[in-house]
Regions:
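A structural signal for conserved, well-ordered secondary-structure elements
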Residues: 1-287
Length: 287
């Protein structure tokens, strides 16, 4: 069965435009929910020992520090609180000691993480540089490998992938940390590979079918690669579902964001990059 993807290209334009608009607006007015490793602060994962020691009781005890408390894995509780920008190492350690004294023997500590504001700022800069470097390198790779409509289509869809991934973190409020950087770079790498495979097949068919209309040729090429695309996407998504369900609270955000990047990467590979390519009329017979 042949699917006519180009028939619905205008709908795909509207969907992608709406997603980009939502992403940009969310980034402008809501921003990103920076994690402790970027914003600086204290993160503690604890498990109550005493019967009836609830998250509400813990929140009341720690109210003077204005913490964020989150239930994870049924029993464990994640405690997060910021630190003043000028906090010294001694002050940071003192704050941890104060919290431990308040909680007393009511909890067990699974993880304690302290990130100073200075280190957090350096990590933010490092993360931004990593993303910019990856984007530039991928853009150069695309430009060297392709020319004309191919390069423009891959470049625009690649940029769209970045915008949508940042928008996803902003809209959902998922913690933006070093893991998020890894998710974005991994997802974009997956997406650009998918685009290259599809473009290679289109390029082969352009040389093979000299008189076939461009829309039909793109549909043919996508259908020829669809089984490979779907097998790769579905198998990776199933792995993410497994991580989401059984990997614990610390991996759920990773699985959710990675799953979104796979879906969006597949969408932009099939529609956005190919729609832009279609508008370039690669052959004289298509004019």
């Amino acid at each position: 069965m042949k699917l006519h993807f180009m028939k619905y290209r205008k709908i795909a334009y509207v969907i992608s435009g709406a997603l980009v608009l939502l992403s940009v607006l969310s980034l402008l007015f809501r921003g990103l929910n920076y994690g402790i490793d970027f914003s600086g602060g204290i993160s503690m994962e604890v498990t109550p020992i005493e019967e009836g020691y609830t998250i509400d009781k813990m929140r009341n005890q720690l109210s003077e520090f204005n913490p964020e408390l989150q239930q994870v894995d049924g029993k464990s509780i994640l405690i997060r609180l910021g630190l003043p920008k000028d906090a010294t190492d001694a002050q940071q350690n003192e704050r941890v000691s104060q919290i431990k004294n308040i909680l007393g023997e009511n909890v067990e500590y699974s993880q304690v993480q302290i990130v100073g504001p200075k280190i957090g700022g350096e990590l933010v800069r490092g993360g931004i540089l990593a993303i910019l470097f990856a984007f530039v390198m991928m853009a150069i790779y695309v430009w060297i490998r392709y020319r004309g409509g191919y390069a423009v289509g891959a470049f625009v869809s690649l940029f769209l992938d970045f915008v949508l991934m940042f928008g996803f973190f902003s809209i959902t409020g998922l913690e933006f940390n070093q893991t998020a950087i890894a998710v974005i770079l991994t997802g974009i790498g997956y997406s650009i590979n998918d685009k290259v495979v599809n473009y290679d097949r289109i390029d082969e068919n352009v040389k093979k079918y000299h008189k076939m209309p461009m829309a039909d040729l793109i549909d043919l090429s996508v259908n020829e690669m669809l089984r490979r695309t779907m097998l790769t996407s579905v198998s990776t998504l199933l792995a993410m579902v497994g991580i989401f369900l059984f990997g614990g609270a610390m991996l759920r955000d990773f699985a959710l964001a990675m799953g979104f990047s796979i879906v969006m990467g597949t969408f932009t590979s099939i529609y956005i990059s190919n729609m832009i390519l279609y508008n370039f009329n690669l052959r004289d017979t298509d004019k």
